[in-house]
Amino acid sequence: MQIPNRLQPFYENLVFERHDNQMVINFGPQHPSAHGQLRLILELEGEKVTRAVPDVGYLHRGMEKMGENMIYNEFIPTTDRMDYIAASSNNHAFALTVEKLLGIEVPRRAKVIRMMIVELNRIISHLFWLATHALDVGAMSIFLYCFREREFAMDLMEDYCGARLTHSSIRIGGVPLDLPAGWLEKLKSFLEKMPENIALYEGLLSENRIWKMRLENVGIITPEMAKSWGCSGVALRGSGIQWDLRKEQPYELYDEVEFDIPVSDSGDSYGRYKLYMEEMRQTVKILHQLIEMYPSTSSEIMAHAPQYISAPKEQIMTQNYSLMQHFVLVTQGMRPPVGEVYCATESPKGELGFFIRSEGEPYPYRLKIRAPSFYHTGILQDLLPGGYIADVVTIIGNLNIVFGEIDR
């Protein structure tokens, strides 16, 4: 038996031309501005970047393979660890995919609560992005202001599900809990302050000379680049392409709420910053409408599908059949029909999608995750050359990547 040769890391095959004034350096994988375990191999001429090669994989945990060895419900807490800044968005996309495979309809109240949770996560994610991006560029005050508001939003998540970061707040078939007493009033109070806070952030940054010098005409993504690299979210809309899955392929109740999709034609980092600010305003608008919709919905928060979904807790505690059914679903898992589905949502960072191939077993035969940050990291090899070494940190931070969903 012939022993196979050791697999060679891809960078061992890279060839860099040697000439005067040329330098090859490593950026990361341990770097405070890498926003995770990112390694960049940069070729420089003076302070100009002439070549950039992203190297990912330092945070790889085999999530897709883990999902293929877990029953469907068990995988939900694992999705929290992908984009851990907006954990509920991951729960939501996975739950929608399984529900599409099962062919079940979620109760209206559960849809309203889900939308509240994921839109609140969008604000949390955008505030975290602005805080860390501004800190990378050298603005300290905005970091403190953003984390102040983010703390209120995280308190709301903790009041609902008991967790601040990894929420596991959405279930296949609905949501585990109705909104606690007084929660809507707290949310309304938070939303009433957000327009003033967003105006404060813009007042500190939008006309700041240093901020504009660091972001304007830096990291320009053309429409052709955005489409060829598979960009989505703000990275795509910042290049003049109006595409948001909440509008183009509505899910839950997004076709019943009014909101605008901000678009910028500049393609640069400053244009993307302005989009993030406007997106927070639109999210506040959506949440106000959801607060008005909530009281008119029935109290049901889980789908009625005994073959796949456990009965309400009251029935499990009082009826033998419901208890036995719950025991089977928890220990052995549901058995979806044979087939394959893909479902995507508009997460805070772009299009987050799950592909599931089912063979009728309690475990997926194949689970594939389409994470937006993976594509936004790949584009760095086209985006960084031609700029300065000082712009590398600006561009990485501006693209809003998170490595939990890249190395999956």
From Swiss-Prot:
EC top class, as a word: translocase
A Gene Ontology molecular function term of the record: quinone binding
Catalytic function, reaction form: a quinone + NADH + 5 H(+)(in) = a quinol + NAD(+) + 4 H(+)(out)
Signal peptide range: none
Subcellular localization(s) per the UniProt record: Cell inner membrane
Pfam families assigned to the protein according to its UniProt record, in alphabetical order: Complex1_49kDa
Gene Ontology CC: plasma membrane
Tagged with keyword Zinc: no
Chief location: membrane
InterPro entries in alphabetical order: NADH_Q_OxRdtase_suD, NDH1_su_D/H, NiFe-Hase_large
Membrane topology annotation: Peripheral membrane protein
Keywords: Cell inner membrane, Cell membrane, Membrane, NAD, Quinone, Translocase, Transport, Ubiquinone
Purpose: NDH-1 shuttles electrons from NADH, via FMN and iron-sulfur (Fe-S) centers, to quinones in the respiratory chain. The immediate electron acceptor for the enzyme in this species is believed to be ubiquinone. Couples the redox reaction to proton translocation (for every two electrons transferred, four hydrogen ions are translocated across the cytoplasmic membrane), and thus conserves the redox energy in a proton gradient.
Identification of the protein by name: NADH-quinone oxidoreductase subunit D
Lineage of the organism: Bacteria, Pseudomonadati, Campylobacterota, Epsilonproteobacteria, Campylobacterales
Gene name as annotated: nuoD
